Amino acid sequence: MIKTLPAFWAVIPAAGVGARMAADRPKQYLQLGGQTLLEHSLDCFLGHPTLKGVVVSIAADDPYWPGLRCASDPRIQRASGGRERADSVLNALLLLHAQDAADTDWVLVHDAARPNLARTDLDRLLSELADDPVGGLLAVPARDTLKRADANGRVSATVDRSTIWQAYTPQMFRLGALHRALAECLVSDVVVTDEASAIEWSGQAPRLIEGRSDNIKVTRPEDLEWLRQRWAGRR
């Protein structure tokens, strides 16, 4: 029997500047195959039949978002971007709550500069976590040998990679649980770099769902070059 995929909201925090790219604009607005990275990141969600809507968190002075065709898509709402990722995601969740979204609704948070999400990975995440009491995230088992460095940049230890995973997105949690976890982290001055970290801090254990390793986040110029070469091969 085919499992019915759950309905969900998508949240895209897109208020960062991506300083390591050393580009003339925030990295989510760099071009890849005729569209911005942000547009590609949105596409997989906008084409999904169980999507309830999307919230994109944008900086107040962002001059690029209004020029995108997707900015006028009625399925996409804009929330205020915050100082950190957690602030931007929390603002998006507050917007959903203001529109009477339920605490039990699923929310998928995805990086604005992670444009190569496969539909098969999205469906696997939704299917595997549909009945999970906590939620979880796409991730990839560590493949390379890992080294721990000392203060002088020398190897202090080789890390056992057998239980190490790289955290990817989307990350999928219930609206109410994620809202509470992020709010508590901010009040307690706990720095979290992804949503799973906030859920972990609240005492829960998110589930890891193995995804494709090519669902990379664009962080440095070579990441974008790799994707451009891959896109060119699709023609």
UniProtKB/Swiss-Prot annotation:
SUPFAM superfamilies: Nucleotide-diphospho-sugar transferases. The keyword Nucleotidyltransferase applies. Gene3D superfamilies: Spore Coat Polysaccharide Biosynthesis Protein SpsA, Chain A (3.90.550.10). The record marks 20, 27 as: Transition state stabilizer. Keywords: Isoprene biosynthesis, Nucleotidyltransferase, Transferase. It comes from the Bacteria. The keyword DNA damage does not apply. It holds the Pfam family IspD. InterPro entries: IspD (IPR001228), IspD/TarI (IPR034683), IspD/TarI_cytidylyltransf_bact (IPR050088), ISPD_synthase_CS (IPR018294), Nucleotide-diphossugar_trans (IPR029044). The record marks 161, 217 as: Positions MEP for the nucleophilic attack. PANTHER family: 2-C-METHYL-D-ERYTHRITOL 4-PHOSPHATE CYTIDYLYLTRANSFERASE, CHLOROPLASTIC (PTHR32125:SF4). Catalyzes the formation of 4-diphosphocytidyl-2-C-methyl-D-erythritol from CTP and 2-C-methyl-D-erythritol 4-phosphate (MEP). This is 2-C-methyl-D-erythritol 4-phosphate cytidylyltransferase.
